[in-house]
Amino acid sequence: MKIGACFNYKNLHLLKERGFDFWEANLGWLAGISDEEFEKVREVCDRYDLYPYSANGFFTADMKLYEMTERRLQEYCTLAFSRLTQLGHNRMRGRICVVGGGGNRMIPPGFSRVRAEEIFVNSLRVCAEVGLKYDVTLAIEPLNSKETNFVNTLSEALKVCKKADHPHVMCLVDFYHFYCENEPLDVIKEAGELLAHVHLSAPDRYIPSAKDMDVCRKWKKALENIGYKGCVSLEGYWLPDEVTALENFRPVMQIYH
């Protein structure tokens, strides 16, 4: 499996020095920066030959899912996907954009849950149609019930994914949220070929270290059992600092890499 990390582009040298294969960007940030800063990002990526295979932060903070028009979604995705795929366009094909955004998809009080699901499914289809043009696949991220009230488990994400019924709409498993919701590993088997991406952290949301070897081996085995060929991104608390967290991750990296 290829290993990446949700990381600040200014520190990509730290990933490159440790054998990482890619970095995971923030899509909303990437879409919102100036052309000048985007060129700086491109220069750093080229310097270290490390590019964003994936992006999280699909929606910006001001984008409320149940208030957006299809045109707004199309325009946003066109800009965001265009920028993402310009980075390393000659080096990699087929990017992943993680659809998390607990606040963006939070169902407002009194709002119909059935209607919320209809809007979410349609929004996924609209974004995925833009994704077709850029070879970008959406990965629905379940978020634990303390962070949102909609799509908390991988089982729920799979249900939504199947309703969207689009080749560029798939699912992600984030093992922190998976752990929080006490989902059984058998759900990974249920996901099968619909699993497009993985976020990895320890059960306490820190970057995994030697103390997490046993649980990380179990998660890796579950992925192997379905023939998972996708990538894995580190996403968690980089404490006490990025360098120390990366060094502590080395033994776990050997499990997945």
Where are these regions (language model features)?
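N-terminal pre-domain/capping segments
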Residues: 1-93, 125, 166, 193, ...
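Active-site-proximal loop/turn and secondary-structure-junction residues that shape catalytic pockets
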Residues: 9-11, 27-29, 57-61, 103-105, ...
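Short secondary-structure transition/capping segments
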Residues: 35-38, 65-67, 109-111, 151-153, ...
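A short alpha-helix capping/helix-coil boundary motif
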Residues: 19-22, 59-62, 104-108, 137-140, ...
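Active-site acidic/histidine proton-transfer and metal-coordination neighborhood
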Residues: 47, 66-170
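Catalytic-core regions built around general acid/base machinery
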Residues: 37-48, 120-131, 187-190, 218-223
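Histidine-acidic metal/acid-base catalytic patches
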Residues: 1-19, 74-75, 92-94, 151-173, ...
